[in-house]
From Swiss-Prot:
Motif 'HIGH' region per UniProt: ranges: 40-50
Native source organism of the sequence: Legionella pneumophila subsp. pneumophila (strain Philadelphia 1 / ATCC 33152 / DSM 7513)
Subunit structure: Monomer.
Main location: cytoplasm
Name recorded for this polypeptide: Valine--tRNA ligase
Amino acid sequence: MDKTYSPEAIEKALYKKWESHHYFQPRGEGKRFCIMLPPPNVTGSLHMGHGFQHTIMDALTRYHRMLGDKTLWQPGTDHAGISTQLVVERQLEAQGVSRKDLTREQFLDKVWQWKEESGNTITQQMRRLGASVDWSRERFTMDEGLSAAVQKVFVQLYEEGLIYRGTRLVNWDPKLGTAVSDLEVLSEEEDGFLWHIRYPVVDSEEFLIVATTRPETLLGDCAVAIHPDDSRFRHLIGKQVHLPLCDRTIPVIADDYVDKEFGSGCVKITPAHDFNDHEVGKRHQLPQINILTKKGTINKNAPLKYQGMDRFVAREQIIKDLEKEGLLAKTEPHKLKVPRGEKSNVIIEPLLTDQWYVKTKPLAEPAIAAVKKGDIRFIPETWDKTYFQWMDNIEDWCISRQLWWGHRIPAWYDNHGNIYVGYSENDVRFKHKIDQSTPLKQDEDVLDTWFSSALWPFSTLGWPERTPELEQFYPTSVLVTGFDIIFFWVARMIMMGLKFTGKIPFKEVFITGLIRDSEGHKMSKSKGNVLDPLDIVDGIDLDSLIAKRTSNLMLNSVRDRITKATRKEFPEGISAYGTDALRFTYCSLASTGRNVRFDLGRVEGYRNFCNKLWNAARYVLLNTDEEQIDFGDGAFQYSPADQWILSRLQNTVSKVHHYFETYRFDLLANTLYEFVWHEYCDWYLELSKPILQDDQALSAMKRGTRRTLIHVLDQILKLLHPLMPFITEEIWQKTTKFTSENGISIMLSTYPKVNEEFINPAIEEELDWLKSAIQSLRTIRSEMSISPAKLIPLYIRNITPELKERIAKYEKILKTLSKIDKINYLAPDEKVPVSATAVLGEIELLIPMADLIDKEAELSRLNKELAKLNKDIELAQGKLNNPKFTDKAPEEIIAKEKDKLAQAQVAKDKLLQHKNRIESL
């Protein structure tokens, strides 16, 4: 083995071998296990959230494959309607071509061309992270088979009256000219204004003051609402008010929706331009007056003066006109949530438009029942409340989008506006007996991307055909996804799965948290805190990192801020940590919380873990060869240390299975880390040395230790493999000649199971006692600055016959690992010189201090340490007593400072105790 572990030297070659040998394909006749990859956008590249979830899915897939289950991780990509269309439009614009210069067919040809040339970026990146998906089965939401499934579902739902065309309020993006889903609307807090407008009461000197952040929408007002219990305005309920700047009056209505305490307690109701107002309007049978065109300009339903104006130009004009008329009571600054299009960044308008809808209530009822009955289980269980909350209040689903790229709606219109739905124009003509002389025109719209995604678990397995894959792998085993798409994707898959297959789409839903930066902030381009998983794997220099983080940023001030912060956080850029260290970090962070703080320091720690494992394997292989192990006829004798590590291994194996079954990847990673680093490397390898290096030790004992070393290493590699596939495969290939394995690939070997024969609580108790004794003696050495090489005497007080017998049994190990030259037993009242003492149960371990240290030199060193600690304490106290710091600094920074102070004070107390002991010598 090479002296050092170099991930870059092995990862790509190993993955290529796995894929080319088809190791990722389902095999055998074991239990079925299937995971569907949530299809990433074909335009996308791998981000931290993908890396996190893909690691968890891959760990589950590799675990079940090694259990002998017939395992399928089904990959594929999403056509990502808006995103893909925008990418191709921008490419065309760079060539001086507008989408509108092309026919629909010409444009779609360009999109397909782009998809073939550039649409596999994310799948290549998945390979770099070790994803063991079955690439031979890769699907695309617009491939032929999935398109046929989409058509069948649409036609059937329409024929059953569950799809209809209607006029409702939608999120409208005026720049893109399409309806968008709630998930594509980002609401960020921005600085705005609250305009207080007077609405004069008809035939009265009174007026109502209404506060609004969108004065242009008053052109579509249909009422002013007050709370029914608001005594200030109760006398006006049922009266009319003049609508400012418009030649019409509107009623004053009472509704519980109004917050008496906000603004004046009066709310303008604009049913065609606000989702809450729309509901109020329905309750009171108010008209719906749409005042906007699809381009965001004022339409003919408004006074002539404003017609044709852009909505924000109209806003300025309306404010001026209100002032002129004396109807603007006041203007005040106001922070508000502004809904912007995720792709366009323009302000989204609630707009009444004709769209296609799915009637969701009949589909939601069985989907709610499936979770209530326990057929589908959310992990953590608390997420089922979120699911029920959404499903109990479900609205009809707008499924049409005003785009060219996507599944075109299979509906045709004649000249009289009649709608015909079918699989093709010929199908429609045949079904409805329409001859060729009657012109038919297909609907221009495409389906919401989430419509095809909702069919993903069964359409990818061949539905509507009854394929062997559908029979074997549906329902799938588990879905791994984020809480942000429980409604948009998870719920819709459950509804569609039950409707079209009669079965649930998956048995369990594991909801992960969202990856944030080390301080808990959302990762975003504008914050400049985004990390690319592959930059952590391969490393990136500072200049390239800054260029990546600041590309396409318009504002110099933002660019400068991000550059400065990046230089401070990564002065040397990011080191190459390799895939396994990153994957292990992801698993260690996969707790049950909503948010996951990602800290690069942890990746560095787990890179050290890879090094530790590599060095342990080198030690084992250097001390193990075929002659020495002698798997033939030689007898084996197992030392207490061998028996101890084999017993501890069973405990670890048991926990690992439990944590896989309960999706506690954080506890799983921690369990493996503790066993490998502390029990196997720090203790067992050290305990093996006295036996292997002792010329007097029995050959059978040496064989037993060598066999244990290699067996436990083999089991460790298998236990770790689902989390760290590359390093484990590389080492395992070098161990197979000693373990009678087939050596094809670790991923095709058998996952460890608990062997009850090796569980030995008595030996664990003995070795735990021995470890505590050695640890106590090492602590004394460290605290007293005794040279690690110096042999020291040990005195023991309060010894019992049982413990004396135990010490005799382990005397060689105790002396070797603690560097003890002689063990002396004291009578109860026997005096010893000034000693450092450790208490271990009922006995005392004493190390006389005289002659072991240079008293003056040690006191001088301690005084320097104390001076430094006093300075640290003073600085931390100064910060924490300064209101400028405590009032302005983020909570996590204040908490860090408090921790720093507490640690410094503990360290100071220990040093003072040590100083007192030295002074008494």
